[in-house]
């Protein structure tokens, strides 16, 4: 299953993404987070210590994390500020900590948290003046932390459904 977290105020990007993924046999779930009540991670580590796999913050993110447990791919659709994710995108990704375990292991020569569930592939679709290189490196590191691989980073403007590149379609469907 592929989860698309759309943090933008508009649903239009979700419609574009849905049409790009329509010819794949993957189940796609698009979640619009802009109107959801999602708080910032407070770094309490309760998701590791007191309530393993569950965030201590009782808000709308609980629905999202339950669906991420069953997903193989995560696409984050976000605006950018100062070349990076805006606060909505960053907030949604910071809350993914319950997917990990507090114990550390070496993977590919790097120290990483053990996975609580399974690997999750991560991709970013951004709007605005994002720093492509920075976002690509961030996506790769997030995916590595989650045991998966980067699905790529694409500007929303490059997803014109009338002429999407084969590469974008292939990455989104993987």
Report residues per predicted region.
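Glycine-rich phosphate/pyrophosphate-binding loop and the adjoining helix
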Residues: 131-174
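Short, glycine-/small-residue-rich phosphate/pyrophosphate-handling segment
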Residues: 102-149
């Amino acid at each position: 299953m592929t989860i698309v977290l759309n943090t933008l105020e508009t649903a239009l990007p979700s419609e574009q993404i849905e049409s790009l993924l329509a010819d794949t046999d993957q189940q796609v779930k698009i979640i619009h987070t802009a109107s959801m009540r999602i708080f910032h991670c407070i770094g309490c580590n309760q998701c590791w210590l007191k309530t393993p796999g569950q965030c201590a913050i009782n808000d709308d993110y609980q629905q999202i994390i339950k669906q991420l447990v069953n997903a193989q791919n995560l696409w984050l659709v976000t605006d950018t500020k100062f070349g990076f994710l805006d606060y909505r995108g960053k907030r949604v990704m910071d809350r993914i900590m319950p997917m990990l375990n507090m114990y550390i292991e070496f993977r590919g020569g790097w120290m990483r948290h053990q996975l609580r569930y399974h690997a999750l592939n991560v991709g970013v679709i951004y709007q605005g003046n994002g720093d492509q290189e920075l976002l690509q490196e961030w996506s790769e590191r997030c995916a590595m932390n989650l045991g998966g691989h980067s699905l790529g980073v694409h500007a929303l403007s490059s997803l014109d459904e009338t002429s999407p590149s084969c590469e974008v379609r292939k990455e989104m469907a993987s």
